[in-house]
Amino acid sequence: MIKQLTVIFVMMGLWVCGAQSDESEQHKERKQMKVIMKTSMGDIQLALDAEKAPKTVENFLQYVKKGHYTDTIFHRVMDGFMIQGGGFTADMQQKPAPEKVENEAANGLANATGTIAMARTMDPHSASAQFFINVNDNTFLNYPGQDGWGYCVFGEVVEGMDVVNQIKGVATGNAGPHQNVPKEAVVITSIDVVADGE
């Protein structure tokens, strides 16, 4: 199977006023759209930036609403780099993820600690469902990156960074052709959109 993240070690009057206010509120709602990721090690809440990465957020939410992430795992964990998940089950079976998204890494968002970005193959527009959470400031992944594209950031952890830090420290090993796989599965039990007021 193709490894998802290729990295070289060493993204008019009162009516007008009213309309602008409505647009401002809608803009605010988009900026503050959140999801909660429940894992076997605790909850992680993420704020998604639909203003700067609209296609990526839409694609991610489509997978969320379909329940794609339920019972997937963090299958690649590298302390000092990132934790990657959303594509495999605990028995390392890859889930089908046919919908791809255009690379939006040139959106000004950096692969800083605590941000979430899309994993992909060497094809810059191959991102589908797999994502990773940066546990370091991975500036080499930012647009234009080493391949002229970089990796698209589309949100950040707003609660539960302690959980991310626990995950990054788990013991890992090999599972078939896959490296850096947690020896004890870190399961994503669900990802859901956070309701207003939560």
Regions found by a protein language model. Give the residues of each.
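Cyclophilin-like peptidyl-prolyl cis-trans isomerases
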Residues: 5, 17-198
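Sec-dependent signal peptide recognition
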Residues: 2-8
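Hydrophobic h-region of N-terminal signal peptides that target proteins for export
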Residues: 10-18
